[in-house]
């Protein structure tokens, strides 16, 4: 009974009839089935989808779409369909009234269908109101409805044609109308609606076409075709890329992860905080950082006392879980569809064996196989698309959170996480999560596939499968051990990588010092030592990987062998026929994928777990307590800065650096902080900024703060951007600031005035200019409180005096502001309201200048000792407004070739910054300020990372092969071939075995068949192990070779290269590109080779079985190649654009880490976070189209593969009477795999081409111009050279590039051995150029320099630079021991080093350190004061004992006492030596033998100081300006 009662009033009509539907040459469904199931299926689909879809639309409102003709048409058709359905219903009621009783379905089906059509019409309108431009749910509904209606339509036509029965005319007409309306609805649903009103896409100049694309376009990724065509016609550029979808932007993604992490972090510290001011913390946390953007709030506000570990994995799951759920559903559907192939193959082989089966069944199976394969393709690539987008979002979120965290971690945390480590977190670790997102579902999917495959195998072969299962179980512990080991190696490798990147960062930051000292080789060895450890671990990983590949490639074969062996041996009557063998083989092939992918997934999870831990450790670092310093408006009148009983240390565990600090600064007063080197002056400012850990006490700083650090921090932006620093432009204030900070003459030097882009870290500015830009930034921001950390040290005293008068002093711009000035310049002290004297981290004295003199304490003694020095501060090189004024013109010249000639304008004498000439400069520089922005881009002094275009050249592959070694390369290919030949032979042998005749219920020769099958398998395994080892070892050879080349080429590059190239580009080469060469390219090569041979093998088998396939395979192959070439052009360029847009992310991040204290002081975190987000989004703008392009290609190529499946099955059906079941089984089972092979081959081809770009980018630097040879044996001078120290300049001229004017010309001067020569000159005179020429940092354009009779151009650079010593302006130290910083080549004994430290006045300090000479200097030497670093540089010079010493403003950053010590040391220890000093303070060279006066690149005067003063020339005017004449 049951459903039969619906079919007719008396239940006489059947619901299903096998004879009508299956066992016939002309199949059809029963009337009842047609009018129930085929009508209800689409209705059930829509009603099942409705609740979830309705809720989805409610939560995803994109704004409503206006009624369009398309929407009106769809709505009208929906209503007509409802009318047609209910016309049928009313007709049935009318029939009943006429006593014609039809089956119940004539009433039920039109009712259900009518209501469903009303629901569909409602959804059409609801989708419009919610902004859905193209609906997948509705399109699938119309498609299912049409397919079901097509079956009924065919049946009705056949009924009308084949029988004499009377046709129900009314129902015939209504059904035809219904069918046509469905067809029109389906066609209309293929077209998208207009964008919703007020949608962002309307205002976006380059919106991503994805959301406006139709459903059909989205599932086939047709919407990216426009970009693919564009990329095929010409190389893509950044401007061709679309904007990022809103839900993929940092603005949308990062806040979610940041908030969830903050909540998780808060949970781990439930216990009350044992802090002095915990109650105040709670009340302040809401408003103390009101400025900080919302998503950063959680990270910036929370203090960081941890009680237990927060779980980052839980947070990531909470944030990205919903995306993974979507991918879970798609993956589950795909996995189930995957097993339809073997099941249909089983039916197909049965069909071939059953000669009486009707032909249509074969075609039906073929069609079904094709449809299932196409569905599988569409679902698989939607799954992949979701995974990749999730991975992209995951990376965006992680990078965003790391950046936000980096802005708030404490200084002690910064020491544990160096710049290199944090950059690695952003590049390598974030990438690991991105990769994991693709594979994460395999954790459950692989076991599911294995279980389903084993179940179907059990059905096919029975208990014999248990033998295969046993083999698999045996392999599990082997792989578990390998996974554990891999994790250990992974941790070790990452540690080495961090150390290497950290060291490279330092090398790149201090490259000028390395070149001047000729230390490149020592540091190259240090890098290679770390690299050697890294490669050692990589080699161990490679052996493991080879073992892993061996076990996993052999696993399916071993499973098959053991299963078949047990099956045929257990019972002689078990026949291995084609159906059993090839269905099992198809299942084993399915089994191969999860078994092959599992190790990849495990290693990906292992890598991600290592990264997860590193990331969690970083995100759990202590953060600065925003409430340790009370900021903001203060009602009481105590003062602008109030510090009571405050004790500070650099970290919670360190002893206090500042003890019992008590002072109050009245509003608007000027305070000086003085003291010896390393007494805690800079620490005091850091404490007021909240950069130190407050142990106890109370600190209030009123209003906003502006901070000028001792070492100026300059951004890679225009001069104007550096000064405005994110604030609004106020022309009049800006001009006032420029003038007050003595920057007007510099604007004349710079080609585009303040619009000139200055290089990274301001490399193209002198120390003095950098300091003045840093000062101008602070002055412009108009803060309430100003903290100056010795800003006058890097500028000449004359300029310092101007700045003090115009800016800092009682009559300066800031006269009404509160100012705290750390200074070594005692001549300004009488003008101070209060002076704080620091001694060993405490305030030893405090009061006005007069009060302190009266106290007759340490301060008075200090002043008496240095009374002369005070006077000498007035006497200085007044010739220039900055400390190192040769440099602006000289390095400013590093500009684009076309416009370079225009730039080189030397300054006239009027450039001297003085009251008399101020007016004329102001006018000329105002014009500079107003130069049009249109020219801005032509004056960038640094070069952005550029993307190459076109195909990756074959030479790049050849270079990589050579790096591997040609022998290993060819051996690998040979072993790959052996492996695949053995694989094909074993399967062909199996097909012959299955075709063996059955005699008396058994097959003969079973033992032989089994033995040969096993032998082929073993030879396959040996070849697999061989090629795995060869590729892995070859990859390591290539890694070593390419890294060595890159390192050598970068170190050999001239200084101009580093001034043009942002360090982010170089760091990217050493981190991301080398990581790609280390870890990504070798496995890709392995998979590429494997896929290539798999495709070739499958085609050979199909052609052997059905030679007619030769008609189809070549054209399909041609389509395949065309589509692939079409794709690769775009994909390759997108990868390059992604690489290029990645560098600015690192550069900006590096820049932020270096200037984090300035950013925090100015409270600019919000703006910098936004900038970082924009740079990350720019990077993802190139990455997103590349992942879509991958899917676009895969869908098209899998369709080609599905066509091969279709034709292989079709030809097998056509030729079923001629072919053996074994061959058909072999052919179809291989064709089933070809789709996956093709897909994998293209992915690997594309991956190989896109990743080989890393080799291309590394090799790029091999072609750069190089410096001269480091050493030339033939011309190497004697080890005792130079004995005399005589330096002759003969007609010497110098230019910075071939197309530029000379900056030094016709220099003819002889400096005798032992002479002390001062070099002075006005701005741009060429003082620094002379030293750069002497060290051959820039080569001579004309003339020559002779030292002790040897032309320095003829000898090696190291031979020269080792023999001359310089004490540079910027004292740079490297992380490592103090001993390494003094003697990196380990050439000197401890006695020598201690003696040099004693002479440099550092012996007491170093002796007091726990580790003495092994004291670890932090990155950049940050754990020593600038003065102490300068003394270390002096100790280096003393240690080298060279005959020629060059001083480049070496005493700019030290106090007067230290300056005096340095000068006396130089006089005593270098008495016999030739000393060249670029004079910073004229008084220091007044006792020199001679003074060399340069002007406009020429020597204008050269004589003893006394004679020059009497001559009343240029030197006299400079001395007069300084008060020395």
UniProtKB/Swiss-Prot annotation:
Its main location: membrane. One of its GO terms (biological process) is cyclic nucleotide transport. It catalyses: ATP + H2O + xenobioticSide 1 = ADP + phosphate + xenobioticSide 2; an S-substituted glutathione(in) + ATP + H2O = an S-substituted glutathione(out) + ADP + phosphate + H(+); sphing-4-enine 1-phosphate(in) + ATP + H2O = sphing-4-enine 1-phosphate(out) + ADP + phosphate + H(+); leukotriene C4(in) + ATP + H2O = leukotriene C4(out) + ADP + phosphate + H(+). Residues 324-607, 969-1250 form the ABC transmembrane type-1 domain. One of its GO terms (cellular component) is basolateral plasma membrane. ATP 1 binds at residues 675-682. The keyword ATP-binding applies. Keywords: ATP-binding, Cell membrane, Hydrolase, Lipid transport, Membrane, Nucleotide-binding, Repeat, Translocase, Transmembrane, Transmembrane helix, Transport. Residues 641-865, 1289-1521 form the ABC transporter domain. Residues 871-882, 908-928 have a biased composition (Polar residues). Mediates export of organic anions and drugs from the cytoplasm. Mediates ATP-dependent transport of glutathione and glutathione conjugates, leukotriene C4, estradiol-17-beta-o-glucuronide and other xenobiotics. Hydrolyzes ATP with low efficiency. Mediates ATP-dependent, GSH-independent cyclic GMP-AMP (cGAMP) export. Thus, by limiting intracellular cGAMP concentrations negatively regulates the cGAS-STING pathway. This is Multidrug resistance-associated protein 1. It comes from Gallus gallus (Chicken). The gene is ABCC1.
């Amino acid at each position: 009974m049951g459903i039969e009662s619906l079919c007719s009033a008396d239940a006489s009509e059947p619901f299903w009839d096998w004879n009508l539907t299956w066992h016939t040459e002309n199949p059809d469904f029963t009337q009842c089935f047609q009018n129930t199931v085929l009508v209800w299926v689409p209705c059930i689909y829509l009603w099942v989808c409705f609740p979830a879809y309705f809720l989805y639309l409610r939560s995803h409102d994109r704004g409503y779409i206006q009624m369009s003709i398309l929407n009106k048409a769809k709505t009208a058709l929906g209503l007509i369909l409802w009318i047609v359905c209910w016309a049928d219903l009313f007709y049935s009621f009318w029939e009943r009234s006429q006593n014609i009783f039809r089956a119940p379905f004539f009433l039920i089906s039109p009712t259900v269908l009518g209501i469903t059509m009303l629901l569909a019409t409602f959804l059409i309108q609801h989708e419009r109101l919610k902004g859905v431009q193209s609906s997948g749910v509705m399109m699938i509904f119309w498609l299912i409805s049409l397919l079901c209606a097509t079956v009924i339509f065919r049946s009705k036509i056949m009924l009308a044609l084949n029988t004499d029965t009377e046709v129900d005319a009314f129902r015939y007409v209504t059904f035809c109308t219904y069918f046509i309306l469905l067809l029109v609805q389906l066609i209309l649903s293929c077209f998208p609606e207009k964008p919703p009103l007020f949608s962002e896409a309307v205002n976006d100049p380059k919106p991503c076409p994805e959301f406006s694309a139709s459903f059909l376009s989205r599932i086939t990724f047709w919407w990216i075709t426009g970009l693919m065509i564009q990329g095929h016609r010409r190389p893509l550029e950044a401007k061709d890329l679309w904007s990022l979808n809103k839900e993929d932007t940092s603005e949308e993604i990062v806040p979610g992860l940041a908030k969830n992490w903050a909540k998780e972090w808060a949970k781990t510290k439930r216990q009350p905080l044992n802090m002095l001011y915990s109650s105040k913390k709670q009340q302040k946390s809401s408003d103390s950082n009101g400025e900080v953007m919302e998503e950063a709030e959680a990270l910036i506000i929370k203090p960081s006392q941890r009680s237990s570990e927060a779980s980052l994995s839980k947070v990531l799951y909470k944030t990205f879980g919903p995306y993974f759920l979507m991918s879970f559903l798609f993956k589950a559907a795909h996995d189930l569809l995957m097993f339809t192939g073997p099941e249909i193959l089983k039916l197909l082989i049965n069909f071939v064996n059953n000669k009486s089966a009707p032909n249509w069944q074969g075609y039906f199976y073929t069609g079904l196989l094709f449809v299932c394969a196409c569905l599988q393709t569409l679902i698989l690539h939607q799954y992949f698309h979701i995974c990749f987008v999730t991975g992209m979002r995951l990376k965006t979120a992680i990078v965003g959170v790391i950046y936000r965290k980096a802005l708030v971690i404490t200084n002690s945390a910064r020491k544990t996480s160096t710049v290199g480590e944090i950059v690695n977190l952003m590049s390598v670790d974030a990438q690991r999560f991105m990769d994991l997102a693709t594979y994460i579902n395999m954790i459950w999917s692989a076991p599911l596939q294995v279980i389903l495959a084993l179940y179907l195998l059990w059905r096919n072969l029975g208990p014999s499968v248990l033998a295969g299962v046993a083999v698999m179980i045996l392999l599990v512990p082997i792989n578990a051990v390998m996974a554990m080991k891999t994790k250990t190696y992974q941790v070790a490798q990452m540690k080495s990588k961090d150390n290497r990147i950290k060291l490279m960062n330092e090398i790149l930051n201090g490259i000028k010092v390395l070149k001047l000292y000729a230390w490149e080789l020592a540091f190259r060895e240090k890098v290679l030592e770390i690299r050697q450890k890294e490669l050692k671990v990589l080699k161990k990983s490679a052996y493991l990987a080879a073992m892993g590949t061996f076990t996993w490639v052999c696993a399916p074969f071993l499973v098959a062998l053991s299963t078949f062996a047990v099956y045929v041996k257990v019972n002689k009557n078990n026949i291995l026929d084609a159906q059993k063998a090839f269905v099992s083989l198809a299942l084993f092939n399915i089994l191969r994928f999860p078994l092959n992918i599992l190790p990849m997934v495990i290693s990906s999870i292992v890598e991600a777990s290592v990264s997860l831990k590193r990331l969690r450790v970083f995100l759990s670092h202590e953060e600065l307590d925003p409430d340790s310093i009370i900021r903001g408006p203060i009602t009481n009148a105590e003062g602008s800065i109030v510090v009571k009983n405050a004790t500070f240390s650099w970290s919670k565990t360190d002893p206090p650096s500042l003890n019992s600090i008590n002072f109050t600064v009245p509003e608007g007063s000027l305070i000086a902080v003085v003291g010896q080197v390393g007494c805690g002056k800079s620490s005091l400012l850091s404490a007021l900024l909240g950069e130190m850990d407050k142990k106890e006490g109370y600190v209030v700083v009123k209003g906003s703060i502006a901070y000028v650090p001792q070492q100026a921090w300059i951004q890679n932006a225009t001069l104007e951007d550096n000064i405005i620093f994110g604030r609004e432009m106020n022309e009049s204030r800006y001009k006032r600031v420029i003038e007050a900070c003595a920057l007007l003459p510099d604007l004349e030097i710079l080609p585009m005035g303040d619009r000139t882009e200055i290089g990274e870290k301001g490399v193209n500015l002198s120390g003095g200019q950098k300091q003045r830009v840093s000062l101008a930034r602070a002055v412009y921001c108009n803060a309430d409180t100003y903290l100056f950390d010795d800003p006058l040290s890097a500028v000449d005293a004359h300029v310092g005096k101007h700045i003090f008068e115009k800016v800092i002093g009682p009559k300066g711009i800031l006269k009404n502001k509160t100012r705290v000035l750390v200074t070594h310049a005692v001549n300004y002290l009488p003008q101070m309201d209060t002076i704080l004297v620091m001694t060993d981290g405490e305030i030893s004295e405090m009061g006005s200048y007069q009060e302190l003199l009266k106290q007759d304490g340490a301060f008075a003694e200090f002043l008496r000792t240095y009374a002369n020095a005070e006077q000498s501060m007035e006497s200085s090189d007044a010739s220039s407004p900055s400390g190192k004024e040769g440099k602006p013109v000289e390095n400013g010249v590093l500009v684009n070739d076309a416009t370079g000639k225009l730039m080189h304008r030397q300054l006239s004498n009027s450039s001297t910054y003085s009251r008399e000439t101020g007016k004329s400069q102001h006018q000329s520089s105002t014009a500079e300020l107003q130069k049009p922005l249109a020219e801005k881009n032509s004056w960038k002094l640094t070069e952005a990372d550029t993307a190459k275009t076109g195909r990756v050249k074959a030479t790049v592959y050849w270079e990589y092969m050579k790096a591997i070694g040609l022998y290993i390369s060819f051996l690998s290919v040979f072993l790959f071939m052996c492996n695949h030949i053995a694989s094909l032979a074993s399967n062909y042998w199996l097909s012959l075995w299955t075709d063996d005749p059955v005699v008396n219920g058994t097959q003969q020769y079973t033992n032989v068949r089994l033995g040969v099958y096993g032998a082929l398998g073993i030879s396959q395994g040996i070849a697999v192990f061989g090629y795995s080892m060869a590729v892995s070892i070859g990859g390591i050879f290539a890694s070593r070779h390419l890294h060595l080349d890159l390192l050598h080429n970068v170190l050999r590059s001239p200084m101009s290269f580093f001034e043009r190239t942002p360090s982010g580009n170089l760091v990217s080469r050493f981190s991301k590109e080398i990581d790609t060469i280390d870890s990504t390219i070798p496995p890709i090569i392995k998979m590429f080779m494997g896929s290539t041979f798999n495709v070739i093998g499958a085609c050979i088998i199909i052609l052997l079985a059905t030679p007619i396939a030769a008609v189809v395979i070549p054209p399909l192959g041609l389509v395949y190649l065309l589509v692939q070439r079409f794709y690769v052009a775009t994909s390759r360029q997108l990868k390059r654009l992604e690489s290029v847009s990645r560098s600015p992310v690192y550069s900006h991040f590096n820049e932020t880490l270096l200037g984090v204290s300035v950013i925090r002081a100015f409270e600019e975190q919000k703006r910098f976070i936004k900038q970082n987000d924009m740079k990350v989004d720019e990077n993802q703008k190139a990455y997103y189209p590349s992942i879509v392009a991958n899917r676009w290609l895969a869908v098209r190529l899998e369709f080609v593969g599905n066509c091969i499946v279709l034709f292989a099955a079709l030809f097998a059906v056509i030729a079923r009477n001629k072919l053996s079941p074994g061959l058909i089984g072999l052919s179809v089972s291989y064709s089933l795999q070809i789709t996956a092979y093709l897909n994998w081959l293209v992915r690997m081809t594309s991956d190989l081409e896109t990743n080989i770009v890393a080799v291309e980018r590394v090799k790029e630097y091999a072609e750069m111009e190089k410096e001269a040879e480091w050493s030339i044996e033939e011309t190497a001078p004697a080890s005792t050279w130079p004995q005399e120290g005589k330096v002759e300049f003969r007609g010497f001229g110098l230019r910075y590039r071939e197309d530029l004017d000379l900056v030094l010309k016709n220099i003819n001067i002889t400096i005798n051995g032992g002479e002390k020569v001062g070099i002075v000159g006005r701005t741009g005179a060429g003082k620094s150029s002379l030293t750069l020429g002497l060290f051959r940092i820039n080569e001579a354009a004309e003339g020559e320099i002779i030292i002790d009779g040897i032309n320095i151009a003829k000898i090696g650079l190291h031979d020269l630079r080792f023999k001359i010593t310089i004490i540079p302006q910027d004292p740079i130290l490297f992380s490592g021991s103090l001993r390494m910083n003094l003697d990196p080549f380990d050439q000197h004994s401890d006695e020598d080093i201690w003696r040099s430290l004693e002479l440099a006045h550092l012996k007491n300090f170093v002796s007091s350190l726990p580790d003495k000479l092994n004291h670890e200097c932090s990155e950049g030497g940050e754990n020593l004061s600038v003065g102490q670093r300068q003394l270390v540089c002096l100790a280096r010079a003393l240690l080298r004992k060279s005959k020629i010493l060059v001083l480049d403003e070496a005493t700019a950053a030290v106090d007067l006492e230290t300056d005096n010590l340095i000068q006396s040391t130089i006089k005593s220890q270098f008495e016999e030596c030739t000393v060249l000093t670029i004079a910073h303070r004229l008084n220091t060279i007044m006792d020199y033998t001679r003074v060399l006066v340069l002007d406009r690149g020429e020597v204008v005067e050269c004589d003893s100081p006394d004679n020059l003063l009497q001559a009343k020339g240029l030197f006299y005017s400079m001395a007069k300006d300084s008060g020395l004449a």
